């Protein structure tokens, strides 16, 4: 009898979970911010979307969650009624590729080779949601009057990270290799690396053209100033955890000791201070 009651409760919870999930997105508004030239940034729920909207049509960088796709499409039409031609993925996570199946019916999906491999391994991922054009190192598109460069970077957030440079507008979309003003996630199971994060950001700071505007994977539109702060946080917090590991401290002890006060405001509901310390601890212990 008890087992039967449990089974009934589980049956009732499935649609409830789906309803709650739908409600999570019910009040999400997609907002557009003009960045420079033909480039815009869309915010909503999930990773920031980069947009090139001009005479050749529309190109998007990332596309958030599947339930938001119609609203994202409506926001794109307000910027430019022209057709969607290209869909770029900075990496494989669902808050950046959730709309692939929807937008993949309209434009060609382009991403690093490992994005297709990892998305292809996901149960239920339809073929239309997979990248149809892949690259290993870099790729250029000539679209809306400028060269748009996709460059794969060494493992940082994942093993399939790319940054997108709108060369004419002088705008760079970093995907999740840059979280502005907050702790990032490191997908250790997906090939991510704290050492790669630090090196990639240090290299980017040296190469960024003067006056460039930066679209982070998460957080507000930024400049190299915020990128430098992000790099400083990565270096300082990783050193704190590295010293704790060298001293034989456990993860719990390291979390209880915490981080310098200056980084308290970088915690977010998704990546709390304790979670960030855990990611650092696991990543640095594995070297």
Regions found by a protein language model. Give the residues of each.
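Conserved beta-strand hairpin/beta-sheet module of binuclear metal-dependent hydrolase folds
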Residues: 30-75, 162-166, 170-174
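Bacterial N-terminal signal peptides that target proteins for export
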Residues: 1-9, 14-19
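Active-site metal-binding motif and surrounding structural segment of the metallo-beta-lactamase
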Residues: 32, 55-59, 67-110
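Extracytoplasmic/secreted envelope proteins and their assembly/folding machinery
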Residues: 36, 49, 69-73, 100, ...
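Divalent metal-coordination and catalytic microenvironments
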Residues: 38, 52, 62, 76, ...
């Amino acid at each position: 009898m008890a087992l039967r009651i449990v089974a009934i409760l589980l049956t009732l919870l499935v649609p409830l979970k789906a309803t709650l999930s739908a409600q999570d997105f019910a009040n999400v508004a997609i907002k557009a911010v003009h960045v420079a030239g033909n480039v815009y940034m869309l915010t909503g729920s999930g990773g920031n979307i980069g947009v090139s909207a001009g005479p050749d049509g529309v190109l998007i960088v990332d596309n958030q969650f599947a339930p938001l796709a119609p609203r994202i499409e409506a926001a794109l039409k307000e910027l430019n009624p022209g057709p969607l031609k290209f869909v770029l993925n900075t990496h494989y996570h669902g808050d950046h590729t959730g709309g692939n199946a929807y937008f993949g019916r309209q434009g060609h999906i382009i991403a690093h080779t490992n994005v297709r491999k990892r998305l292809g391994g996901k149960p239920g991922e339809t073929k239309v949601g997979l990248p149809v054009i892949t690259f290993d190192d870099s790729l250029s598109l000539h679209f809306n009057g400028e060269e748009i460069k996709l460059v794969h970077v060494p493992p940082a957030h994942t093993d399939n990270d790319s940054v997108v440079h709108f060369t004419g507008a002088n705008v760079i979309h970093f995907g999740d290799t840059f979280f502005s003003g907050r702790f990032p996630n490191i997908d250790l199971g997906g090939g991510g690396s704290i050492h790669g994060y630090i090196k990639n950001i240090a290299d980017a700071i040296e190469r960024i053209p003067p006056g460039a505007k930066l679209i982070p994977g998460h957080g507000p539109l930024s400049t190299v100033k915020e990128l430098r702060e992000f790099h400083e946080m990565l270096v300082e917090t990783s050193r704190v955890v590295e010293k704790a590991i060298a001293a034989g401290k456990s993860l719990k002890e390291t979390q209880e000791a915490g981080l310098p006060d200056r980084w308290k405001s970088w915690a977010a509901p998704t990546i709390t201070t304790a979670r960030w310390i855990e990611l650092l601890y696991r990543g640095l212990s594995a070297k």
